[in-house]
Amino acid sequence: LVGQGDEVIVVDPAYDSYDPAVRLAGARCVHVPLLPPSFRFDWDRVREAVTPRTRMIIVNSPQNPSCTVLSRDDLRELARLADEHDLYVLSDEVYEHLVYDGAVHCSVLSEPGLAARSLAVFSYGKSLHATGLRVGYCIAPAPLTTELRRVHQFNTFTIATALQHAVAAYLAEKPDVFATLAPFFTAKRRLLTEGLAGSVLRILPSAGTYFTLVDYSASEMLGTLDDTQAASVLLESVGVASIPLAP
């Protein structure tokens, strides 16, 4: 789908495996920042990043790590952009069931202008609290899955048969499990928010995923540090592990 000299638009911050995968294909990522505190897509900025070499845009909703969720209007903007420039869309939807506060996950597969040019990726590992399983799937039109199959065997060969049977058996036993995920993680988010209430750390809104962003600018210990430095200090000084937004 992409090759030597092609460009792929990726928003920042983003899951750190996108960039290496693009570079392995001989293409390069063009990074478009999502700005705090909302981290919403700025479609004008995305359009400015498109060049004659652009072949694909990668989107992730709910988004790791900004915790934002693309709206139906966002998907329509994406559809217009992809149609105007004949772009493929790789949609990372592994957190599809982890949306909160009335937010709704909108898949690219549900948008008529996107379904024919998109690959949507899903994960049972994320949905079933077992990321080590590495069990997932991709939905795309036949011409795109043909290209996917050309490389899939050499990337993963296959998913362990026992794990596939385990997931199938679990879903047959608990067909309503996905409906329990949002309340489960909402309770976890509330516990973290209440634990940090009254501290100098400010929780930013989290509409989806199992991540939460923290504004530490008011902290005397951390306020002057960048995110990587702050993560190191938190770990070494107080034994709290965090993940910086910087790649």
What are these regions (language model features)?
Residues 1-247:
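PLP-dependent class I/II
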